[in-house]
Amino acid sequence: MGATYSTTWPEAHNMPITPQIKRSQVIAFHTSTKWKFHFDSLKVTNKLVVIDFTATWCGPCKNMDPIINDFAAKYTDVEFVKIDVDELADVAQEYGVQAMPTFVLIKKGKVVDKIVGADKDGLKMKIEKHRVMFI
């Protein structure tokens, strides 16, 4: 019994006992209805939302995917959303997206910044600028 029980403890697998840090993830939306419902729920928060407007055929978008995933892991206080312009053309049009990738930064339901193109450093700078919250 002891052997079976001990394998469930983290130290039995050389795992740390401390709790895991919550990893942010990129949320993909495939319907306008789900996006609008989610967007409405964010209007009451001060959380920065980064919308990644992308397309499956877009080479620079694919190059940015691992960078966005890294940012989501690093900036866990920021929400990262992915919207395919071919699936949700109405949402892309609403934000004036004309080129991919386009990153729209939103706080309290309002656009606070925008980056057009695969500009990793520019996006990082704007995320760091807008994620600062005053308590």
Name every feature range the model reports, one short phrase each:
Residues 34, 63, 67-70, 110, ...:
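Acidic, Ser/Thr-rich intrinsically disordered and amphipathic helical segments
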Residues 52-54, 105:
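Structural cue for short, hydrophobic secondary-structure segments
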Residues 58-61:
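Short cysteine clusters
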Residues 30, 53, 64-90, 97:
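Thiol-based oxidoreductase modules, predominantly thioredoxin-like and allied folds used
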Residues 1-27:
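N-terminal targeting signals for export/organelle localization
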